[in-house]
Amino acid sequence: MVYIEAIDAQEVMDSRGNPTVRAAVRLSDGTRAAAIVPSGASTGKREALELRDGDKERYLGKGVLKACANIKTEIAAQLDGVSPYDQSKIDLILKKIDGTENYSELGANATLGVSMAIARASAQSLRLPLYRYLGGSNALTLPTPMLNIINGGSHADNTVDFQEYMIMPLGFDTFAESLRASAEIYHHLKAILKGSGHITSIGDEGGFAPNLKNNEEPIEIILKAIEQAGYKPLDEIAIALDVASSELVDENGMYHLAGEGKVLDSAGMIAYYENLVAKYPIVSIEDGLSEDDWEGWKLLTQKLGNKIQLVGDDLFVTNKKILQEGIEKNIANAILIKPNQIGSVSETMQSVRLAQRNNYKCIMSHRSGESEDTFIADFAVALNTGEIKTGSTARSERIAKYNRLLEIEREISDAEYIGKTLFKR
């Protein structure tokens, strides 16, 4: 019987120059595998706890030596000799060792790193691709990417309020074709920005971060880039937004669009979105209202839920209990899936299955602090999420995921790319 022989951890760097956890596993058959945990810039209040050292003398307090120590001691001892092939059991043990709802003892960056590394080691031990090990024979769907090509909000130092302006390549038959179109649009966008005298430096996720006059100008420029690249807005390339409204709201529930000099209540924000959706080929809005504004979310879903995808990120934080409440109250119609928000592979899978059973769309997602780890690419295919957010066609930590998806598409002879049928049009 194959069993877990050793677990180790190391403090490594993420794409923003901050430390993060690398967990490594060795099995008794000699298999070795590792995983690197990502980290977010804008985070939901109900996310699982990312354990940081708080020592201002090291990495400005952001070190993860405590999380690494928890892996090397408590976690390694409890998982020593356990079969790696029962992921649910592994993750239940991790939950039991921690003893809290949000991994505040061990740190979700410790538990997720171990959970991912064991899943990867198990797949390698069985000589299976990770997507096949986690998803079985039904893992066939290549996700439609949501590519963040203009950054604002907390992901960039500029005057744009919304955090992400994304393109979704819908009108294509393969993932490879969709990625090519996206890359071409990205290069046209760069040329347009440069020609207009804007800076073409990029944000955390590879998108450009120009100083633009309002929150609509990025959409106008993106549409120009789509057309210059020879593609049709909406039919082939649609627009998606991540507003990250929890970063815009004050203690009185008012939303501050500083770039436009506006202060709006929930109804005002909803009217603002209705105007945008009527005016532009927008198919998805993420975190359109604050994570605490459930009454506003209910109204937003009533107004726009039959027209576009309304994604809960900070709203649901990949947590099945919160998602269940949202389903019961008819809040949103899609969920962003970030494994580090919940702390283990199994709990992530549970949230996806709950969403899919209730016809909520799922978007597998990276974080702004990423690495060369490609786990989420396989995970998206394994769970047939149908959509993925993993940045622009720039920055190698983003490209790594796209290249892995290209590889997977070649491996699966009957792979499906469902961009054309993803949304009602």
Curated annotation (Swiss-Prot):
Keywords: Cytoplasm, Glycolysis, Lyase, Magnesium, Metal-binding, Secreted. Mg(2+) binds at residues 242, 286, 313. Its main location: cytoplasm. Catalyzes the reversible conversion of 2-phosphoglycerate (2-PG) into phosphoenolpyruvate (PEP). It is essential for the degradation of carbohydrates via glycolysis. Transmembrane segments: none annotated. This is Enolase. It is an enzyme of class 4 (lyase). It is found in: Cytoplasm; Secreted; Cell surface. CDD domains: enolase. Binds a second Mg(2+) ion via substrate during catalysis. GO terms for molecular function: magnesium ion binding; phosphopyruvate hydratase activity. It catalyses: (2R)-2-phosphoglycerate = phosphoenolpyruvate + H2O. (2R)-2-phosphoglycerate binds at residues 163, 338, 367-368, 389. Its cofactor is Mg(2+). Pathway: Carbohydrate degradation; glycolysis; pyruvate from D-glyceraldehyde 3-phosphate: step 4/5. Belongs to the enolase family. The active site is at 205 (proton donor), 338 (proton acceptor). The gene is eno. The keyword Iron-sulfur does not apply.
